[in-house]
């Protein structure tokens, strides 16, 4: 009897994982339709104080939106990574400024260490009542949407490319991250 229950639970878990993976895959391409006041770029890994490709793609997409629409501030997020001497947010700001973004238009949030904190702390800077465009890689869109809704952030999503070398890994990892997010919400740790 116990074996049947365990098998059933495993089947339910696998079915749920497949459904979540499909949601992640089919929500990977987003373009905004409104006029946000701020762009939030969640942090990602850096190497030698420079954004790695996933973060560069996010920043390139934010820059693209900024150059076309202007009149927005960009909030870069992320604390200092292990082995780095500046924060992810500062590395991102430096990259955007090197592309031609006015330094006064980039605000850094340098304390967040995960996606939930990225969004929460960034929206605290300008206020939850503002409208945000959140720019991240395609694999991240579904979870960012869930977190933003949970935190009460008015938002739209703008998806950046995902580097090919991390594509499969990140899409699979995202399902685990969604399960973890659900666990944190249920246990009140968000």
Give the positions of each predicted feature.
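N-terminal membrane-anchoring alpha-helices
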Residues: 1-37, 184, 190
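A structural signal for short, hydrophobic/glycine-enriched beta-strand patches
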Residues: 25-172
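A transmembrane-helix-recognition feature enriched in membrane-embedded lipid enzymes
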Residues: 167-190
């Amino acid at each position: 009897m116990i074996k049947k229950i365990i098998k059933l639970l495993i089947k339910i878990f696998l079915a749920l994982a497949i459904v979540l993976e499909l949601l992640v895959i089919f929500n990977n391409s987003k373009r905004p339709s409104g006029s946000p006041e701020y762009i939030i770029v969640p942090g990602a890994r850096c190497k030698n104080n420079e954004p790695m490709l996933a973060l560069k793609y996010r920043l390139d997409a934010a820059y693209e939106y900024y150059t076309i629409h202007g009149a927005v501030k960009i909030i870069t997020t992320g604390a200092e990574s292990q082995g780095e001497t500046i924060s992810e947010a500062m590395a991102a700001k430096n990259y955007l400024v090197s592309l031609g973004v006015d330094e006064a238009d980039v605000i850094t949030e340098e304390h967040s260490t995960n996606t939930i904190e990225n969004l929460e702390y960034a929206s605290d800077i300008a206020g939850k009542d503002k409208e945000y465009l959140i720019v991240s890689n395609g694999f991240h869109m579904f979870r960012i949407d869930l977190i933003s809704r949970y935190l009460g952030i008015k938002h739209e999503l703008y998806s950046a490319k995902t580097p090919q070398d991390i594509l499969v890994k990140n899409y699979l990892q995202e399902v685990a991250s969604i399960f973890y997010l659900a666990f944190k919400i249920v246990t009140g740790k968000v």
